[in-house]
A protein has these predicted regions:
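Amphipathic alpha-helices that form helix-helix packing interfaces
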Residues: 146, 150-153, 174, 488
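Conserved catalytic cores of very large enzyme subunits
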Residues: 1-139, 163-165, 169-710
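Extended non-globular scaffold/tether segments
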Residues: 137-149
Length: 710
């Protein structure tokens, strides 16, 4: 829509100053009279939300901007702000700070006044417990900051009346919506969307990243339906409101120089199996497509009962080249959460995604975190008696490979190496998350939007949430590992064209002088071609790693899930790993996520989905990523049906996720050579989309080298 285009141009004007939310926090910290950490933080949160002068764009319909965090400070004030805030360290991604889907459904149902009433009720229950009472007061103060921010925006609308370029009727309407969102319960679709967006901008101002908007087509639908039926809203205007909101995610790039990953989840199914797709699902899809920016990161839950028209609508948007929505298999994700979690059925069916593809129990568990587990590294320890080829890292000594007489024996020793790696990974995880004084790292505002925290008077990371935290171990290189094991089995134990000792020497030499052996390894069966000789190792890989990590728990008793996702880390991970038995050279990227190694899946997309769907992804509660690249012509009328049928087959066989780039190798190569001509080219990277020309060369080449299907 025209208003979206105009708003995007406004957003691009960065203005003066630099990103300094610490300035507003410091105002609260320096004036607080409280001695406990929670209320000190709350005072800083209040000034962060309430003190900045609101930034309202001329083409705004839904307000809430992070431009008001751009401040032009003199050197002394800037130093004072930094030093003041440094005395109050914050949690980070590794210690559960963000990657969270808030409980927007509850706040829309009861409004900010209802949240205040719940806090008051809880204060009466916990009045004799000082720490809980203080935390409830901190939540109250933080929530007051949100209310003040909404009212400041309403007042600023009045101040802008008569200013050039501002529509007075629109300003009055926005002000009315902000006041209702601040002082009552949202009554209209616009007011509900306004409240959600203002809360989201508050999270960004706090410094939180990858804060999801959750199942927006579900919690906004009652407002949409009621307004539509009463005649005060049209579907067209609802779509414009959504676009007006989503395009502001682009502000993050303007203000901070990088893209935020704001996941929105649409579709899905109910416990009775019926589809949750509604009219708003289509409008969200259309709005995101019209924005044509790297965010939001749209995810579509696809079940066996999802209408074909909805899947087709998803493919139409993917076909524009923006790389989303990512398509999620609802049945597999629900089964995985049921199998690995401790969650009630109702909450499982209301799951959404945070960050890239991570499954999350919406609004009822602490923020997500994950880490990287580089599985191919353990070949070095296996072949070199527990020492990496460069001598920089160590596993366990499982003996000389010359003593291994069978594939089964080799697998047993390889499993021992991986199991030790899992143990060390969890040891590091626990050390990072073992907080000596967690009460000094409280999050009173975020805790307001998690079920259980208000009632218990506890922080989201200190037992307040309904469920414990979950951690994801992103296991790298399934394609590299499977191809390597198949190559070992074929060349060493089946055809006996080499020995494990020769293979070890070849890998240490990075195959220099062993070119013939490398050629034999490259000729072995490869993952992604529907060949059980190699695919059986994918089945083993998923099962073994999930069972190993399942032995451990988070500090608060939650589960350790595996993720078969890379988020471009396959490139950096490969950079620190020597040559592998599949013929991969040292420092080359590992295979990406759940995808076959690029260029080795030579039998077409059907063979790929048949291979990738063989493991039991009900063991992968975090999620997987299968990257596929199809030519733009595959998305034309009359051809999308074939692609939809392929996806249905993949999901029916147990595949968990698929995301698609609709582009060609020629376009990507030309963009690398002439970036100035492709500033708006959006591609799917891994679990997110980005402007292609802003990516570093290694990531650009990784996307370029993905197998072109169709």
């Amino acid at each position: 829509m025209k208003s979206t285009v105009l708003l995007k141009e406004e957003i691009k004007e960065k203005g003066v100053g630099s990103w300094r939310p610490d300035y507003y926090r410091a105002l609260g910290y320096s004036s607080t009279s409280h001695e406990d950490n929670a209320r000190q933080r709350a005072d800083a949160i209040y000034t962060l939300f309430a003190k900045p002068t609101p930034h309202i764009f001329k083409n705004d319909l839904i307000v809430g901007s992070i431009h008001d965090m751009m401040v032009d400070l003199d050197e002394e004030t800037g130093r004072f702000s930094s030093e003041t805030c440094s005395r109050y360290p914050e949690r980070n991604f590794g210690t559960n700070a963000d990657h969270y889907a808030p409980d927007y459904e509850t706040v829309l149902r009861e409004g900010i006044p209802g949240m205040f009433r719940r806090i008051e009720s809880s204060k009466k229950v916990h009045g004799k417990e000082e720490s809980r009472l203080h935390f409830l007061e901190a939540m109250e103060t933080a929530l007051s900051g949100l209310k003040a921010r909404l009212l400041r925006y309403a007042d600023h609308c009045m101040e802008l009346r008569g200013e050039k370029g501002y529509d007075e009727g629109r300003l009055d309407w926005i002000a009315s919506n902000c006041r209702q969102a601040a002082q009552g319960v949202p009554e209209t679709f616009a007011q509900a969307l306004q409240l959600v967006w203002m809360i989201h901008t508050c999270f960004v101002c706090e410094g939180r990243y990858a804060m999801a908007l959750g199942r927006i087509d579900q919690y906004l639908y009652p407002f949409f339906r009621r307004d539509l039926d009463s005649g005060i809203l049209t579907a067209e205007f609802a779509g414009e409101l959504l676009e007006n909101t989503f395009i502001k995610i682009y502000e993050y790039r303007v203000c901070k120089g990088s893209d935020d990953v704001v996941n929105i989840c649409i579709g899905g199914c109910s416990p009775d199996g019926s589809s949750d797709v509604n009219e708003l699902s289509y409008l969200v899809l259309e709005a995101v497509g019209n924005c044509a920016t790297p965010g939001p990161n749209l995810s579509a839950r696809i079940s066996k009962n999802t209408p074909d028209t909805f899947l087709d609508a998803c493919l139409r948007v993917i076909g524009t080249g923006i790389g989303y929505p990512a398509l999620m298999n609802d049945e597999v994700n629900i089964e995985a959460l049921r199998r690995y979690g401790c969650y009630e059925e109702e909450d499982i069916y209301n799951y959404s995604m945070v960050g890239c593809i991570e499954n999350f129990i919406t609004g009822k568990q602490p923020p997500w975190n994950d880490g990287r587990f580089d599985t191919p590294r353990f070949f070095e320890y296996l072949f070199n008696r527990g020492v990496s080829y460069d001598g920089e890292s160590r596993g366990i000594d499982t003996g000389n490979v010359s003593d291994i007489s069978s594939m089964a024996e080799l697998m047993g020793k390889f499993e021992r190496q991986i199991a030790e790696g899992v143990r060390l990974y969890m040891e590091r995880f626990w050390a990072r998350n073992r907080q000596e004084h967690p009460e000094e790292l409280t999050m009173p505002f975020l805790s307001c939007f998690c079920a259980g925290c208000i009632e218990k008077g506890l922080d989201i990371n200190m037992g307040g949430s309904k469920y414990p935290s979950a951690h994801g171990a992103a296991v790298m290189g399934i394609g590299t590992v499977c191809d390597s094991l198949a190559a070992i089995e074929k060349t060493v134990f089946t055809e006996k064209t080499t020995t494990l000792e020769e293979l070890r020497d070849a890998m240490i030499a990075d195959f220099k002088g062993y070119e013939r052996l490398r050629a034999l390894l490259l000729e072995a069966p490869k993952y992604g071609n529907n060949d059980d000789f190699v695919d059986k190792y994918a089945v083993w890989y998923v099962h073994f790693l999930s069972e190993e990590f399942r032995k451990y728990h988070t500090p608060d008793g939650g589960c350790i899930y595996i993720a078969i996702a890379a988020n471009t880390s396959n490139i950096s991970a490969g950079g620190g790993i020597g040559a592998t038995p599949d013929g991969r050279l040292a420092k080359a990227p590992l295979s990406d996520a759940a995808s076959p190694t690029y260029g080795r899946d030579v039998n077409g997309p059907t063979a790929v989905v048949l291979s990738v769907s063989k493991p039991d992804y009900g063991q992968v509660a975090c999620g997987t990523v299968l990257n596929q690249k199809f030519s733009p012509g595959m998305f034309a009328d009359g051809k999308r049906e074939k692609l939809a049928a392929l996806i249905r087959v993949y999901f029916a066989r147990g595949g968990q996720e698929m995301q698609i780039n609709a582009t060609s190798r020629d376009i990507l190569k030309d963009a690398m050579e002439h970036p100035e001509q492709y500033s708006d080219l959006v591609v799917r990277v891994s679990g997110f989309s980005a402007y292609y020309v802003t990516l570093n060369r290694a990531v650009q080449e990784d996307i370029l080298n993905r197998t072109q299907q169709g």
